[in-house]
Amino acid sequence: KYFTSFGYIDQESFFKSRDFDYKRYNTRSNIDIKVNERINFSVDLSYRQDIRERPAKTALSNIWIDLSTAQPIFPTRLSENMVIPDPSISSVSYSGSTTGNRNPLARSDRNVFGTYDRFDNTFRGKIGFKYKVPGITGLTLRADMNLTLLDRSEKTFRKPYNVYRQNLDTNELILEGVGNGVSSISDSQFRRTMVYPLISAEYIKEVGKHNLKVLILAEQTTRKFSMFSATRKNLFTTSIPELFIGSENEQTNDGSSGPDIGRKSAVARV
């Protein structure tokens, strides 16, 4: 027997920029093989990719903060006929916040604020074996091996943008602040592996009006991880969001690895 499925999800956000959408691709395949009356094999495989693309990792919470400090007397966008002093840098309208560099619309737009891209690739596999012992009716031996692999990639890109207050009387733009004052880019990779073997023996027998059930099993869980990250600031240009564009004078690196879970257990039940 076998079963195979494919899935796709495209979830739209409620922002006009559509920069908070979520996508997922997944596939699954299960195969059960009956060799004979005593031996059975099973193989279960699944893969899933989650894609999150937004202006920032914590953009949603910061958008509500910017909205709470914005004043309704200021326009949400600059007038189209305004002459931008520096067209090479994105420009947004002043929202009335005391810090001067806040704008909720800027935080919801990847073209203005920057980008945060996260890709999760998850693989799960299971191989099972079941054997009915001849000569001992009701005794079944079973062995399973489970494996889970997670590969996560995250990239964060920040670029400065100017926040202008518009003087309608003089048709002049006044610089109130700069969002993301320093351009930067960071890239991180995270990998995690979990191995879960299990063996069991089950004995079932009817004795008159009674049922006898005995179960003995042993299992082990091992999970290991590794991660590293790198960041550079003061990019030579914001048109190429890659690490090599940043200055080597302002770079940081980090990383770690090791086991975070290890467990063994045995169970017996009558």
What do these predicted ranges mean?
Residues K1, S13-F20, R28-T122, R142-A143, ...:
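Surface-exposed loop/interface segments of Gram-negative outer-membrane beta-barrel transport/assembly proteins
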Residues Y8-E12:
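Transmembrane beta-strand segments that form the barrel wall of outer-membrane beta-barrel proteins
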Residues K130-G135:
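Long hydrophobic segments that form regular secondary structure
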